[in-house]
Regions:
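Hydrophobic, small-residue-rich alpha-helical packing segments that form membrane-like cores
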Residues: 82, 92, 110-113
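Conserved, helical-rich catalytic subdomain that frames metal- and/or nucleotide-binding sites
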Residues: 83, 132-166
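Helix N-cap motif at beta-to-alpha junctions
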Residues: 79, 105-110
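Charge-rich, low-aromatic oligomerization/scaffolding segments with amphipathic character
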Residues: 110-122
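A generic local secondary-structure boundary/capping motif
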Residues: 91-93, 151
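FabD-like malonyl-/acyl-CoA
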Residues: 1-88, 96, 120-132, 136, ...
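A generic structural motif
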Residues: 99-104
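Short, hinge-like loop/turn segments at secondary-structure boundaries
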Residues: 47-51, 109, 141-145
Length: 166
């Protein structure tokens, strides 16, 4: 559950799996990844070097580790239902399917949201993470991460990339 180790390890595994699939003859015509998976996709598509990807992922993990607060919950509902119920301080971190999303953010505000979810018959489960990733709580580290990213060489993709960001 410690992001400082988990993120680099996830990247290494995802990149290695992608390289193995390519070695077996799988020829992707488009790449997609979520969170750390986007770094693996960028690397496999030739947009960034493995060395730069490791630097980005490791620095990202260190910055996010320093925040170390907040909660994440998997919520069984549609975005259109959740958005009006979502208080300030929480974010939709991921839309995994039409009726399964992840809500992330401030721990105290999350408790209020969970009460609202209970009142509306919405089921949920806590994700065991060390912080509220993909939420507004990560905003304080954006400037520092941008400084790291400015040092990286980005190349045109050799394989198309589908971003999971909106």
């Amino acid at each position: 559950n410690d992001t400082i180790y988990a993120q680099p390890l996830l990247f290494i595994i995802e990149y290695a799996l992608g390289k193995q699939l390519i070695a077996w003859g799988v020829e992707p015509n488009i790449m997609i990844g979520h969170s750390i998976g986007e770094f693996a996709a960028f690397c496999l598509a030739g947009m960034i070097s493995v060395e730069d990807a490791v630097i980005l992922v490791s620095e990202r993990a260190s910055l996010m580790h320093a925040i170390n607060k907040g909660k994440m919950y998997s919520v069984h509902s549609e975005e259109e239902v959740i958005m009006p119920l979502l208080p300030a301080g929480l974010s939709i971190a991921a839309i995994n399917t039409k009726d399964l999303l992840v809500v992330s953010g401030n721990e105290d505000v999350m408790e209020k949201f969970l009460q609202i979810a209970d009142e509306n018959g919405i089921t949920y489960g806590q994700l065991h993470t060390s912080a509220a990733f993909h939420s507004c709580l990560m905003e304080p580290v954006l400037a520092d991460f941008y400084e790291v990213a400015k040092k990286v060489t980005f190349n045109p993709a050799k394989i198309r990339i589908a971003s999971t960001l909106n």
